[in-house]
Amino acid sequence: MKKILELGEPISATYSHAAHTLAILANEKNNRDWLMNCFIQIFGGENDFLDYQDFGFMECPLIHTQHIGIDMVDIGWKNRLDFVKMAIINNYYIYAEMNVSKINAYEINKPFAHDALVYGFDEENKRFLISDFIGLKKYGSAWI
């Protein structure tokens, strides 16, 4: 079995958590008004103070999120990969922190935790499709 959830081009790809959310939202044209009104804020004045506020994807009204602890995954499934496949089959994206030193696409040798978006799998080739700053460079997708 093979399944890939829809993912578009994010309007901004600065931080992974925002890029993942924006890539999911990119497929819906109805989301554009909200994104332009509440996410993209462009304003400049001569002596304006810019107060940085992070984008909280958990508070995005256009996406329903659930936080499932790894302990719950371990209780309910024989293996974590089965949980990921089941979630994708049911049209859920998986946002997870991973040790990217274990993933060749990242080209990192030392243990390093980074958040990736898992949105597809291919059982025949035993691989998953992720989106992230692969190799901590440009935002994109890779089969792992």
What are these regions (language model features)?
Residues 2-28, 33-144:
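Conserved active-site-adjacent core of cysteine acyl-enzyme catalytic domains
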